[in-house]
Amino acid sequence: MRLTEERIPNNSKILYSIIIIIKKEIISIKGMVKGVSIKFRSYSETIPRLLELINLGKEIKKHSKIVLKPYLSPIEGEKSLSTSAAFVEQVLRFCLRNKNPVSEIFIAEGVDGEDTMEMFSKLGYTKLAERYSVGLIDLNNTEVERTEKYDFIKFHEIMYPKILKEGFVISLPPLALGEEVAFIGSLSNMLGAFPARHYKGFFSSTKSKIRKWPMKYAVHDILKCKLPDFAIVDSSEKGVILAGLPREVDKQAAKLLGFEWNQVDYLKLIESTFLEKKIKEGKEAIPNVIAQ
């Protein structure tokens, strides 16, 4: 395959741009801590190609636990605003091919207001896990550790799933408008990390205790426990798949839905409080995956 690359220098430490033209298909990569979009053709063709391009396989070999975090929601009528199992399958297949032989892969979610294991079954994840011999984890009932942070905005402490703290977490949301947040993205997807066992109300099956304040604060504080390490957004209905570091991926996702990222309250809050600090300190997750 012939590749043509055009490099446009800007700031040698942080920013550069690469335009890669592959068979007339343009993929843009912007910056060392940015993201990638690729034209969608099919899950089976686009996902492996994208993940090979950004060299994700090299990164996941470093980790003993890989956690795929889809977004699952209750089924209303015949539809569910959930991550497609077919989309997750292609990410899973890539991880299985590229992981360290002793590494484990899990699919984890904590559905709000429904039994997670039943949702796994209804949406095809149980069969997927059986087919590839990987574990399903209900984050609503998994082992947690008490996390206290001085820079939580609203929560005094959060009971956070240990599997997410210990694993390399790949957030896998569908791109869609949300009811309580502007849209479902790789960062707001992590609301599923609040275990219902600790956050549901006495007379409710939903995680009502995270709704004492506007949801942007719950998103912010759960991300203070841990950012997802990587994000792949199913924006196939918009004609592309997005992948990269969560902050940038969600900014690009916002544009696809017609928003400026600083119009999205949770993104604006996150940007202003801690992600800039992480970038300056070089601590944002896998800053060199896209650059390699």
Where are these regions (language model features)?
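N-terminal amphipathic/basic-hydrophobic helices that include classical n-h-c signal peptides
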Residues: M1-K24
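Extended, low-polarity segments enriched in aliphatic/aromatic residues
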Residues: I22-K79, A86-Q292
